[in-house]
Amino acid sequence: MKNKAKVVVIGGGVVGVSTLYHLAKKGWSDVVLCERKELTSGSTWHAAGLMPLFNMSYSVGQIHKYSVKFYQELEKETGQDVGFREVSNIRLAENQDRMDEYRQYAGVAETIGVKVNFLTPEEIQKAWPLCSIDGLVGAIQHPEDGYIQPNDLTQALAKGARALGAEIYRQTAVTALEQLPDDSWIVTTDKGEIKCDVVVSCSGNFVRQTGEMVGLDIPVIPVEHQYIVTEAHPQILERQKEGLPEMGVLRGSDGAWYMRCLLYTSDAADE
């Protein structure tokens, strides 16, 4: 393990490994990442992997647009599948106010360069045959939206970062952080110390503990997120046999839910 680096990234989830990769991509090859266990072992391994292009913020929308393009480029760069599926995303509207919100967003999307379609209830059912259209006013669709597999993405990012000169230390827990008078840092781990110029905390569920190391009380706690996994639906299996495309991600904005196929194969379960 190095005892000196330009940057130390704490946390081996998708955020930490993406940070490491992008620093190395920008030319900061003297960067390392410390992960207390294994990559994705925190919350990344069971993340939904959705890539919602919908965002009312121009700046955040640009990041979302970049991400969709980047995932495809990363596969080519590393030769590692990230599980990217461009299956579209449909957001339902149960009232006119919601549709007005979608139309307002369409202006932001046009400025960013994100394609959107507006669907009538009949068009919704054509795209998502299992969806009941009772009480629906319409929907907005992102045809270039979809999802990725978070674990596969993280491993591809790690492969790309290593190829650019970055180093990843698994089973290496950060136990203390100390800032020196010259503003550099001593990062103490259970494997030794690393002196660096910059520390980036991407410690996810452990961010409060990381904050305490530098005297910060960060009011963040992990919470449970419920989801239901069903057996494969007969109509979805029939669609696959007929060679029809995956129905994509369906969101109920007024009910705060989403659904999608977990795996689009003959023995798949639906989420």
Listing of model-derived features with the role each one plays in the protein:
Residues 3-5, 190-198:
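Core beta-strand elements of the Rossmann-like FAD/NAD(P) dinucleotide-binding domain
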Residues 3-13:
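Beta1/beta-strand and adjacent pyrophosphate-binding region of the FAD-binding site
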Residues 25-43:
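Glycine-rich FAD pyrophosphate-binding loop
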Residues 49-127, 254-259:
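Dinucleotide-binding Rossmann-like beta1-alpha1 core, especially the glycine-rich loop
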Residues 82-91, 125-164:
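Helix-loop-beta segment of a Rossmann-like dinucleotide-binding subdomain
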Residues 196-245:
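Central helical "cap/lid" subdomain
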Residues 264-271:
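Conserved small/polar residues in nucleotide/adenosyl-binding loops
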